[in-house]
Amino acid sequence: MLKIKTNEISFNIKDYVHLIMGSKKIGKSTLFSEIGRAECGLDKTLCISMGDEDGHQVLKGLPYVNPKNWDEFHEFVHDMVTHPENYPFELVSIDTIDVMVDMAIDKILKEHLIKYKEPCKSINDAFGGYGRGKEAVCRLISNEIELIKQSKYGLFLIGHNKVRPQEDKDGIKFLQLTSNLESQYYNAFAYKAAIICNIDVEQNIGDAILDSSGKQRKAGKLQNSERYMYFRSDGYIDAGSRFRNIPNRVPFTDDPKIAAQNYINAVKEGIKDADEFSGSDEEFNKLAKKDNDIKEEKASKAAIANIKADEDEKRVELFDKFKELLKSAGTKQKNEAVNLVKEWEYTTKDLETKASLEELQQLITILEKDNFVS
């Protein structure tokens, strides 16, 4: 029977998933690194720099890994979660989610090719079409985020923003500064995030010069610009938070250390309001430390349990596929597979319960060879 629990507000900002959007080269990766420096130290801050992203290159001392495809990313995340003793990090970023989506799409297209023996024209056509390909991409993304979310690591998602035309339920069209991603992919991240921060540059333009007919003859001159981190949507800027009274916006200053502190203070203000906390900063930090210790102790166990459940489900799927292929495979392929099973000293039942996922996949690869010999 389900146990009823009473929710407690965590004072640890690492307990919340953060999504930060901004234009290219505005300083998103730098902001994350400085938040990490302030909260846990740079040596405990990890950037997962996806594919060709290189925001980490100018950040001296920032630990990073650079997975080039989905399998590398997936394997690293699973190892990081199942063996936390090997990874001394407290904060992790995925930089960027735009490239993460590209990797996930490539992965699903490859899975479609393996299953159907022919490529599909686009992700829309994968697995029979009707949106199944995109749904599979979103599931991949959601599963990885959930693993990290339930582990000891605090997660920051870094992405690009873009002005997009939108339309409300009444058909009214408007422009919005939102994610660069398609809405379905963006929502896979946004629904997991407790804080969505959107960085915007506000430019102050001097008066334009008009001719006698009122038409602009000379463009206005840029007087200055100011950058802000938005935590609340204003209709044009897409942002949001589960904290009711987090500030609408705070300055994104040229000094990255100050900008990071502005971000941290804004989140802490939201936490304090949600908990109706009125104590000192010292008391807040003690509670945050306590919540962080609880997260480290409990979270990895939950993530490991999830991974085991995923592996059990995958094992059933691979074993069923192995049995189907065995029925139609040629003699040469069957013999090669059987000899390998004997070499491993497995019985058929062992294959279903003890064989690793890699071993089952190896057998499937043998049986899928095209050069059948009857």
Q: Where do the language-model regions lie?
A:
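Interfaces that engage single-stranded nucleic acids at replication/repair/recombination sites
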Residues: 2, 6-22, 26-27, 46, ...
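Conserved P-loop
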Residues: 2-3, 7-94, 98-103
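Short, well-ordered beta-strand core segments
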Residues: 45, 155, 196-198
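Generic beta-sheet signal
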Residues: 48-50, 158, 199
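Conserved nucleotide-binding/hydrolysis micro-motifs of P-loop NTPases
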Residues: 51-55, 97-99, 161-165, 202-205, ...
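Structured loop/turn residues at beta-strand edges in well-structured enzyme cores
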Residues: 87, 151, 191
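P-loop NTPase motor core
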Residues: 98-184
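Conserved GTP-binding G-domain of TRAFAC-class P-loop NTPases and closely related GTPase folds
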Residues: 167-303
